[in-house]
């Protein structure tokens, strides 16, 4: 009888603990959903909560490791599987398209310190649209205007998404093609042509207000990219498949050196680590930025183009 009571008590405690853990998981999910304005049907809610808890455990296990150089954290992507994240936020990886101009001779750097242009353009949120290529170009334009002392502008990314027919809107594109469009047509203000995170019919029938003089390929080596970053930020192609839950630190966990996303290189630190501004909002990363190890980490040297 005593053994039976002991077993019953242990079972009761284990069951209570299990339900307590389940309740904690549910509460965490509910808090996340409220913070991120996510609303689900009852059937989808169970599915999304399962993904949330799986991602949460993966993040916790990663952060407990002593051999990692970066931390993961919860963000707006918590209820997306890795496959869904790649499909919704990144474009198809394509390293076969040759958009590169003439190769550059390697620049010899002397006495060039750290560079940081983060304060010259604001972090944007692309939403569920693979438009990082367009944001990297419109943000390049904004930073160029600000650094040259012209004015603080908000260039329309949606205009590039809708009207640059050499690219494919929310399905992806290439920074050099987008810069060619800005060179020919110019951009209007985002106030007049706001971002909606989806493909639309082009609404711009006249030339824009903000133009560039040209653009050039500035990659091929660490020293080249650093040299040109000393002037202005640079639109770069990157391989971002594993960026989903990046929170802070130095990142090098790239799936390859291909290109499935575009972002804005805004500087480098005294240890030559790259500082890259993304377009996934400030809840992601280091207030919207990621730091990458030097050299060609995540393919950053493959498709860097700079406006001038």
Swiss-Prot record:
Sorted UniProt keywords: Disulfide bond, Hydrolase, Protease, Secreted, Signal, Thiol protease, Zymogen
Entry GO CC: extracellular space; lysosome
InterPro entries (UniProt xref): Papain-like_cys_pep_sf, Peptidase_C1A, Peptidase_C1A_C, Peptidase_C1A_papain-like, Prot_inhib_I29
CDD domains with a match to the protein in the record: Peptidase_C1A (cd02248)
GO BP annotation list: proteolysis involved in protein catabolic process
Disulfide-bond pairs as recorded: 129-170, 254-298
Positions of the record's site feature: Ancestral active site Cys: 132
Secretion signal span: 1-21
Residues of the propeptide: 22-110
Alphabetical list of SUPFAM superfamilies matching this protein: Cysteine proteinases
Keyword Secreted: yes
SMART domains attached to this UniProt entry: Inhibitor_I29, Pept_C1
Entry keyword ATP-binding: no
Catalytic activity: Specificity close to that of papain. As compared to cathepsin B, cathepsin L exhibits higher activity toward protein substrates, but has little activity on Z-Arg-Arg-NHMec, and no peptidyl-dipeptidase activity
Active site (record annotation): 261, 278
GO molecular function, one term: cysteine-type endopeptidase activity
Alphabetical list of PANTHER family matching this protein: CYSTEINE PROTEASE FAMILY C1-RELATED
Family of the protein in this entry: Belongs to the peptidase C1 family.
Protein name per Swiss-Prot or TrEMBL: Putative cathepsin L 3
Organism ancestry: Eukaryota, Sar, Alveolata, Ciliophora, Intramacronucleata
